């Protein structure tokens, strides 16, 4: 029968040691809550940190960029600019399309932003053109966010117009209704319509004009209310044959009479079923297709949204004819799942490595089982809290848990090692557990709260980076907190029941050999420590040198923002000469597609040509290149991009810009490259002067590659210079001229065909097959005041000019975006500094302002706050340690270990060729919390030895170092092995995880070697300083 120690021993652990059943059931409850939480947690690539973003699209076929800007974009911008919570407003006005992107503050709910946008559109309605075919349409989507899923719809038997009609009514609408879907776009432009192609010579010969034809068609096709008859006994609804549904009906339409004979539309025009916009086209690989891009709402969960789409697809495709084939070309969730699975595997590897190192040190199966239970219990219990906080299982939270593996085992190791020491001295297991847990309880609390204090500044990081790492910091803090609870409850209880003198003394050949090895290591460490303590100033100079070296490394190490990920999808922009037509661009696109599809890493390709909400001009094309899975290709995405660009360079007359899609999207515009820099002015003339000069200098910088600009001011314009006096004499005004031109060349939507399922347009244009180019303007006829027909050439001269293909605004002022990539041998920090230096040499006028955008702007913000973030972490730790130790000096001793960790981390990043990005910075901040554990364990035991055994400070710290050497080595190796799988990561998403592992492993190795010697020396130096200070105060008091 064991004699119980007095009730004062055991500290907070006593109750749990004495009540094993209650303790076990409490841990089972934590385990079950964690398992349930894990099953309920959503899966995503990263925490949901999207800015609330809304895109407003207005289509006005035939309108020039200048007309779109002044008549559509500007009135809408004035209303949007008055909305509260608006962070940034950008717009792009091109031929026939206005796209305005509204980005709101992170704190504003998306639904509130939606209400404000709708109210602003309503307020601007009266200011918009009266003949606008459709009102502005808004979507809760970030246009720069790559689609979560891309589908291609093809048919070998049906025309694309019929295919799009079915897809729009039967598939796209249903997918749009799925929760989380922000926008479904159909690229390819094959919406059904009746196209009326006027024969200009025919109508001129008959004395007619295009306006006569337009008026006849609009009057012949109506769909309006007609009333009803209410008799004594019956009510009758009125109806009529006021609708024309087919091209044949329109051919038979009488548009005029001549000499008593009817002139039908078919006599003067080709009327056919066709596409609403003939200048749009999309291809899947080499086959013409309707490409369906599904984008999510900001904040929506990608995995659950994609799963819902896939569940619905079989049902939707069953409603389509057998000749129509629906193919999923890309699904971002495939790579997201693979990345999360790889991170989960690395988490399991970290747990296995940590348990292995525990066994290596303890050499006892029961003693290994105890922390082997504590580690997964702490991690699994974290899932329950994550559900409560609306977190997800993503790369960052799983990285936090992987790193936590090395943290959470530390507490259990410290407790087991201390209890085992008493058992080996002859104490009974229960008494040893109570005594050992009570003795170590304060150390556990110090370790836990000082480590959590390091994470507190992460919660106060601003903007999107702070939101991004909020889940990381809280997940890690929760795991550490649960670990402390388990270590003070379950661990000592299990030690009291599972450990014994017999089990600890039982040794096999491996145990005996390893014990001798550890004894030799400790003896060698003791001899080295004695020498170091005899030469304190030399050791102090080493510590100061590490501080200086860490500062120098911080200044010179290449700096970046976020690792470039290989998600298996490449976005591309194809650029041709500014005067390129749709036909010419489509031909060039097919040439490029042939080259791209020959690459062995490419699985599929979708491409799009034409002007719509995503593509600003006819001389550009959008591409999405889907790569094979990572394990099926030899090269990562950056090498594939370099290879594709080299191959496409052989295609004459085009420039190809490629960038890999990323899980973190900060930009609001689809860019040609990864990084952006803007020039903003009060006028387009100022931009036209300075953009070429800046571009010329930037293209010469070695720190930049793929430098391009969206400034395109060489678009061909046929300027119709009307002699207003001559026109007035003939009774012709400018509205007549505009109408005639719009009827002929604007693909004008002049009437609507209504059906039960959809609405279709009647499109009016001139047939220009026989009169291409500017010669087509000679066929334009206008009606004079006396009813005669007047050729346009009699009242106007045609001048060929240049004008912008698109006009871009940022916060209502003209802007140009310069896009660039960074070569492999330079960092983003180098590129940013080079641009800023170049800008200074130009001496830009005051009305030109410059600013980095998207990721580059976030990089500048993060870089500026990093130093303060680390300072805040150090200050927070000092405050916590000062409160716990009731001392101003001991926290400084503990914090003196930090420079060694910084040196190790920065050196490791340099050797590995990694940039100092936000992921690596998080690793350095975590190192601050890890390496101070060594000092805490040393100082705690040294202070206890001085206080309880009356040892001198030198003897106390010397004995503490030797006594705590094994747990220090064990906990450091556990943390190192917890980070090792991240450092060695090679799977999907490895780019994101590797910097964290590299920094932590390097920092732990260097700090482990140095702090074992520098901390005791600094402890003694501060002890002497304290004694000297006390003696000075005592002397002053005596003199007083």
Swiss-Prot record:
Q: Where in the cell is it found?
A: Cell inner membrane
Q: What induces it?
A: The mdtABC operon is transcriptionally activated by BaeR.
Give the matching Pfam families: ACR_tran
How does it sit in the bilayer?
Multi-pass membrane protein
Mind listing the GO molecular function terms for this protein?
A: xenobiotic transmembrane transporter activity
Question: SUPFAM superfamilies in the record, alphabetically?
Answer: Multidrug efflux transporter AcrB pore domain, PN1, PN2, PC1 and PC2 subdomains, Multidrug efflux transporter AcrB TolC docking domain, DN and DC subdomains, Multidrug efflux transporter AcrB transmembrane domain
Originating species: Escherichia coli O17:K52:H18 (strain UMN026 / ExPEC)
What keyword terms does UniProt attach to this protein? Cell inner membrane, Cell membrane, Membrane, Transmembrane, Transmembrane helix, Transport
Q: What does this protein do?
A: The MdtABC tripartite complex confers resistance against novobiocin and deoxycholate.
Q: Gene behind this chain?
A: mdtB
Q: What is this protein called?
A: Multidrug resistance protein MdtB
- Family membership noted in the UniProt record: Belongs to the resistance-nodulation-cell division (RND) (TC 2.A.6) family. MdtB subfamily.
